Amino acid sequence: MSNVDHAEIAKFEALAHRWWDRESEFKPLHEINPLRVNWIEEHVRLAGKKVLDVGCGGGILSEAMALRGAAVTAIDMGEAPLAVARLHQLESGVEVDYRQSTVEALAAEMPGRFDVVTCLEMLEHVPDPASVIHACHTLVKPGGQVFFSTINRNPKAYLLAIIGAEYLLKLLPRGTHDFRKFIRPSELGAWCRASGLAIGDIVGLTYNPLTRHYKLGTDVDVNYMIQTWREE
């Protein structure tokens, strides 16, 4: 059975043409992207590395890592987001190898091929997150690093990530997230360890509605990122 939620794919296909509009529904992704890339580079210098971006969408993170000197392969199952990513690539001149593939299929084709794997804002949109994590472990070289981000599952996350972000502040379209698919850090950590990934750093991402700024910190109650590596 394919680890793809076709309703999730359709949701992002419908919005794909606005992916690179910094005032669109994707404004939060544009605003947090520098924080994400800088945090990744605190752990691994991207220049000269072979990097895989899983669930790349329109390529916001993919292009940013390529601009840091990485050789980036980026995969997604949405045709429209990939078309937007390739079009923007023509305009920006940033080289990224975009492919339509599941991470599981690519893992069978290219095991141990990448120095770094990123899987950000993707796990909460698939039926079987553990399968994605296992495939990421397969794709990264021994000693290589894998980065994940997702949303915690608790009442605070429901209030802020869904009621606040989607209904009150309207930072995201209604229906972007399903609370039942949110993932506690303990669950993500258990899946990583079961796949052979060692847990490193974990950092929270918070939004201040008064200043309209995002920042990284120790609060992992809602959005968080985790650094792991494949043990040699």
Swiss-Prot record:
Binding-site list for S-adenosyl-L-methionine: R36, G55, D76, L120
EC number per UniProt: 2.1.1.222, 2.1.1.64
Matches recorded under SUPFAM superfamilies: S-adenosyl-L-methionine-dependent methyltransferases
Record's catalysed reaction(s): a 3-demethylubiquinol + S-adenosyl-L-methionine = a ubiquinol + S-adenosyl-L-homocysteine + H(+); a 3-(all-trans-polyprenyl)benzene-1,2-diol + S-adenosyl-L-methionine = a 2-methoxy-6-(all-trans-polyprenyl)phenol + S-adenosyl-L-homocysteine + H(+)
Keywords (A to Z) from UniProt: Methyltransferase, S-adenosyl-L-methionine, Transferase, Ubiquinone biosynthesis
UniProt xrefs under CDD domains: AdoMet_MTases
GO biological process, one term: methylation
PANTHER family: METHYLTRANSFERASE, UBIQUINONE BIOSYNTHESIS O-METHYLTRANSFERASE, MITOCHONDRIAL
Protein name: Ubiquinone biosynthesis O-methyltransferase
